[in-house]
Amino acid sequence: MNRTHNNGELRITDVNKKVELIGWVAKKRNLGALVFVDLRDRHGITQVIFDESFNEQLKDVKNEYILDIKGTVVERSSKNPDMPTGDIEIQAEEVKIVNKAATTPMIIADETDALEETRMKYRYLDLRRPALQKNIIRRAKIVRAIHEYLDSEEFVEIETPYLNKSTPEGARDFLVPSRVHNGSFYALPQSPQLFKQLLMVAGFERYYQIARCFRDEDLRADRQPEFTQVDVEMSFMNTDQVIGIGEGLIKKVMKDVMNIDVQLPFPRMTWHDAMETYGIDKPDTRFDLKLVNLNETVKDVDFVVFKSALEAGGHVKGLNVKGEADNYSRKKIDALTELAKKYKAKGLAWLKVTDKGVSGPIAKFFTEEQMSALLEKMNAEVGDLLLFVSDTHYMVVCDALAAIRNHLGKELKLYDPRQFNFLWVGDFPMFEYSEEDGRYYAMHHPFTRPKDSDLDKIDTDPANCLADAYDIVLNGFELGGGSQRIYEEELQDRAFKALGFTQERIDAQFGWFVDAFRYGAPPHAGFALGLDRFAMLLCGCDSLRDVIAFPKNTSATCPMSKAPTPVDNDQLKDLGIEVTEYESEENK
């Protein structure tokens, strides 16, 4: 076995060369006097032609057999412009069957009819598909570019522990029982947050890590229980400088991996402006469908739904879907209404602007003057479809209209899927209040520093305290985020207290961390980028599973290995663990 070339390498300039190729049979066509085989490896496909002298040797060969072929490169009489190797083929002179293959449970091609569960069960076969291999290879190129950039900026790559102390705030931890310390548990890291801050206290100044993280939470298309993030921290740098590092990193990745020169600096937007304009803090700015605040415009309209919301201190917002009045039937509008209801809206009001006037169920509630003011406010013209959501809760209005906006953007093809729009969103609220729990939660995490102008608000006005935090958004996805960090013991204590932590809880869960601030902790900041999500977006995929070699399914299980599985009682006994039947409150 002495492979001379891969299966995506040979060109017309290689005609008459003697070569040896090895690969999987992607397709076999027996024409009697001639047999054609498409030989595949991760680099591509090369067509091999066998004369009838090979018929006996090839009679049992089928897809996914591995062949070692020696032969001569010849020019194809019928060229294939869709293949890089389409100008040539190999005239076989010798063939060896390296290994046989059973009939596969799925078609191994970019277009496969296999169900998701089958693809996951036979992931090693699914990974043979060229499209999936390209994704995994592109992901590797992203990682290489990240290393090159951060190394060039004098960041030090440092590994942090996987076996950590559990700090149950936010998502649930994956727990690891200790055999040596029965009854005690480690937690797998949800992020390296505390350790990377301690590395700043230690004086490393610039740290990074391609970090594996674990969160025991419900899955969706862009979530996995174990995921990878690009984790970066630095000392003595202001927010603009930190953002500059993030932009430089992304520019390097986009150039090296996609051959795209992104323009710096990226646009910036405050959290408040993002919510007002797009209804979401991770807006897709590839299309220009914006929310319109109508509180003042409709305050005197005699429509009880609007009136009751506004009288209760609520909000009314609208969307102008330009030129779509005739294209949206009542059935299609009802579908948008159901989408709004998924986000807790009570309904969706609408109007159509026609050459005969304004029509729709709520048109009768407007006076001529009020309707004129509405049309002017929404920049409405003949042919436009106007959509409205009102509610006493600001976030309900925003969430519902943001979901409708994103749905319309995709349905109406309002953006170029090949376009990449980056955006920084900043000035986040430091805290968000849970009416259900009667307490504040950190919008990012408890170690985020308030803006210098809002330091006093931690204690006196937490609802209006702004964080010195920033998220990077790409095409409507939160790609990552970061912040300046608290580095003073006293300020960190105040932040914990604002979150309702008792001193006992602070000492028990975070005392070991906060104690480091007593020894000259430097001002520091950082960010993390979701590597899986970045790869998903650069590969044009809809699911993280398409850019992770061995992902979990939506039940957080691995159909291939069957993980998680029960373990032997002897193993549990060593750990001091006894498993009992548990019935959740939901199932009682």
Language-model region placement:
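Class II aminoacyl-tRNA synthetase catalytic cores and aaRS-like
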Residues: 1-588
